[in-house]
């Protein structure tokens, strides 16, 4: 055997570097990153996802000649290892992954520097041991390297194989988590399904797109939006303006709740007996049966976003994920600056989901009680996170220790797709539609109703009920059009496109201290909540940019736009380019007189709101009634229960 055959060929060095960097990445998945990996498919994806980009990047250096090619591969491998370790350190400190936007924030970079020493682990040498070995070979054992030119005709084959592997990885990821790239739920999800290197590329592309849109925006764009939204200003209802000044505000988010459940019975038993009682008008709550969600692909995050900012979500993706670093004039920040409210969010999932740990800083939210503040033992968890009953119980305890006035937002989880519940927690029989999603939905909605009743009882016991504004709302539909056949069996009627729009009613219940309950049939949407609450506490909404109008005002605009351009009014609905009667859901033979005007208004609303987000226009807004939020002043620490994944 000749001497050169015993040497390390360039291709062998390439393969070895790809293998060791991938091995370190795989090590980080199970030792340092809490990715919540479950099942064979997710483990297979995890095994697959680092290879493609590592191989694609390093294969470029196979075009070079001699020792220089070895050095380039080494440097490429080192930079990938450095990126991996930087993410490891950042994750240990922030439970999240590095993005270009976080690197642009000085506070994060400074924290990163301090975090290295504080979070160093004894096994961290694993991330660089191969680097040390390769460096030793390149400097001291150059004779081990085969200097012959590598055949370049194989390089495109290697690159093509890397690209093919990426698309195979993406296909598996989309199968296990549909709409992964469009909805961008959580950085952890993206890393779990794509790997840290592909995530960095994805984040870079999104950052460039956002920066380009921002660069083209100007103060003139903001002026156009302000001139448009000023036309929406409503005169406050004198009976309600200031009626809840400096009262605590409790906002309760009912996951995937739709109002077809109200007064619905299954096998003779009410699905939501407590909410049924609140919907009569005989209790303390003002019930809006014609309240619609206005979410897009961001679903839950869109509902939060719209209700706290009176802006629409994006046409694609989630504003939380894609526009989380924008400047905002949010409801909690206005309440703080004008009336001294503190604000918090309570949620039985971890803070990085939907990028909440970053977005909330830009909303000026003071505290985030995420899963690390709750008992996340196995008995308390179902589906995506903490069950609603223990969630509400622990949340009420936290709230009882708060000083008012506070704005507290509780986000439930149990009534979430795929609507699974243990036999122990299920207190109503499933219907027999033949569709496990629809059948399960009845059980989880019933459980949610029970949990809500227990929570309201706790508020009364702790003295928080009487003097608080309480909002209860459904965030978005739970049952999609894919389940129309089962829904027809459950409801006993045909689900037409017009009927499906009716099913987008998610309900809104509003308790105002000192005011009697009623059933208010006003047509309204999530966009209208922010101006309504501002007027209730005595803050005029005309001083702020909003697309919604006060539901209690006589000037309220009852044209309710949806993110896809459809809309509904008190008389008719516009679905897929056709107008239907609200009373009969039949196609209208004569076009409503105000149809064209309303279509233009809806299109303009969506366009203007998109301009605000894409151009980050609030950064230009010099509002004398509002001081810009400084996100660096907010930090959401890990709770006393810690990360229990």
Swiss-Prot record:
Proteolytically cleaved. The chain crosses the membrane at residues 8-28, 44-64, 71-91, 125-145, 154-174. InterPro entries: Alkaline_phosphatase_core_sf, LtaS-like, OpgB/LTA_synthase_biosynth, Sulfatase_N. Mn(2+) binds at residues 255, 300, 475-476. It is an enzyme of class 2 (transferase). Its EC number is 2.7.8.-. The record marks 217-218 as: Cleavage. Keywords: Cell membrane, Cell wall biogenesis/degradation, Manganese, Membrane, Metal-binding, Secreted, Transferase, Transmembrane, Transmembrane helix. Pathway: Cell wall biogenesis; lipoteichoic acid biosynthesis. Substrate binds at residue 416. It is found in: Cell membrane. One of its GO terms (molecular function) is transferase activity. GO terms for cellular component: extracellular region; plasma membrane. Residues 1-7, 65-70, 146-153 are cytoplasmic. It comes from the Bacteria. GO terms for biological process: cell wall organization; lipoteichoic acid biosynthetic process. It is a multi-pass membrane protein. The active site is at 300. SUPFAM superfamilies: Alkaline phosphatase-like. Residues 29-43, 92-124, 175-645 are extracellular. Catalyzes the polymerization of lipoteichoic acid (LTA) polyglycerol phosphate, a reaction that presumably uses phosphatidylglycerol (PG) as substrate. Is required for staphylococcal growth and cell division process. Belongs to the LTA synthase family. This is Lipoteichoic acid synthase. It comes from Staphylococcus haemolyticus (strain JCSC1435). The lineage of its organism: Bacteria, Bacillati, Bacillota, Bacilli, Bacillales.
């Amino acid at each position: 055997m000749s001497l050169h055959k015993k040497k390390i060929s360039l291709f062998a060095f390439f393969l070895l570097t790809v293998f060791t960097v991938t091995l370190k990445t795989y090590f980080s998945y199970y030792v340092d990153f809490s990715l919540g990996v479950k099942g064979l498919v997710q483990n297979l994806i995890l095994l697959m996802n680092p290879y493609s980009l590592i191989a694609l990047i390093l294969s470029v250096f196979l075009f070079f000649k001699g020792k220089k090619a070895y050095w380039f591969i080494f440097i490429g491998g080192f930079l990938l290892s450095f990126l991996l370790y930087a993410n490891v350190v950042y994750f240990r400190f922030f439970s999240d992954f590095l993005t270009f936007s976080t690197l642009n924030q000085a506070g994060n970079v400074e924290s990163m520097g301090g975090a290295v020493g504080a979070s160093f682990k004894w096994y961290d040498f694993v991330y660089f041991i191969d680097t040390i070995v390769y460096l030793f070979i390149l400097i001291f054992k150059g004779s081990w390297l085969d200097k012959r030119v590598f055949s370049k005709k194989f390089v495109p084959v290697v690159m093509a194989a890397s690209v093919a592997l990426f698309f195979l990885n993406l296909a598996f990821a989309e199968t296990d988590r549909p709409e992964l790239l469009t909805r961008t739920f959580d950085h952890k999800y993206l890393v779990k399904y794509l790997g840290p290197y592909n995530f960095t590329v994805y984040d870079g592309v999104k950052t460039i797109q956002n920066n380009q849109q921002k660069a083209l925006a100007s103060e003139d764009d903001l002026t156009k939006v302000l001139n448009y939204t000023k036309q929406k200003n409503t005169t406050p209802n004198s009976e309600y303006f200031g009626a809840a000044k400096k009262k605590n505000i409790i906002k309760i988010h009912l996951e995937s709740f739709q109002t077809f459940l109200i007064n619905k019975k299954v096998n003779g038993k009410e699905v939501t007996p407590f909410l049924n009682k609140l919907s009569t008008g005989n209790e303390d709550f003002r019930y809006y049966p014609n309240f619609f969600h206005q979410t897009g692909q961001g679903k839950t995050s869109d509902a939060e976003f719209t209700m706290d900012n009176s802006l629409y979500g994006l046409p694609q993706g989630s504003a939380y994920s894609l526009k989380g670093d924008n400047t905002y004039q949010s409801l909690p920040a206005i309440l703080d600056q004008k009336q001294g409210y503190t604000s918090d969010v309570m949620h039985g999932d971890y803070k990085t989901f939907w990028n909440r740990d970053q977005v909330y800083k830009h909303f000026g939210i003071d505290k985030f009680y995420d899963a690390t503040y709750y008992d996340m033992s196995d008995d308390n968890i179902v589906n995506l996170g903490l069950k609603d009953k223990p969630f509400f119980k622990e949340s009420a305890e936290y709230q009882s220790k708060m000083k008012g006035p506070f704005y507290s937002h509780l986000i439930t989880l149990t009534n979430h797709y795929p609507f699974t519940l243990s036999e122990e927690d299920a207190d109503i029989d499933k219907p027999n539609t033949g569709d496990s999603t629809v059948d399960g939905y009845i059980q989880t909605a019933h459980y949610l109703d029970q949990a809500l009743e227990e929570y309201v009882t706790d508020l009364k016991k702790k003295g928080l009920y009487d003097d608080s504004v309480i909002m209860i709302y459904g965030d978005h539909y739970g049952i999609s059009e894919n389940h129309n056949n089962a829904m027809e069996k459950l409801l006993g009627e045909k689900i037409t496109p017009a009927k499906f729009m009716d099913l987008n009613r998610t309900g809104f219940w509003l308790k105002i201290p000192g005011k009697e309950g009623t059933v208010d049939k006003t047509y309204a949407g999530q966009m209208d909540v922010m101006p309504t609450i501002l007027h209730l506490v005595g803050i005029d909404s005309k001083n702020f940019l909003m697309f919604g109008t006060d539901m209690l005002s006589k000037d309220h605009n009852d044209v309710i736009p949806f993110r896809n351009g459809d809309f509904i009014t008190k008389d008719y609905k516009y679905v897929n380019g056709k107008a239907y009667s609200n009373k009969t859901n039949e196609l209208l033979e004569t076009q409503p007189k105000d149809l064209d005007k309303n279509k233009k208004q809806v299109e303009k609303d969506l366009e203007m709101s998109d301009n605000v987000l894409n151009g980050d226009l609030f950064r230009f807004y010099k509002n004398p009634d509002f001081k810009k939020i400084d996100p660096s002043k907010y930090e959401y620490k890990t709770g006393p229960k810690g990360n229990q994944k």
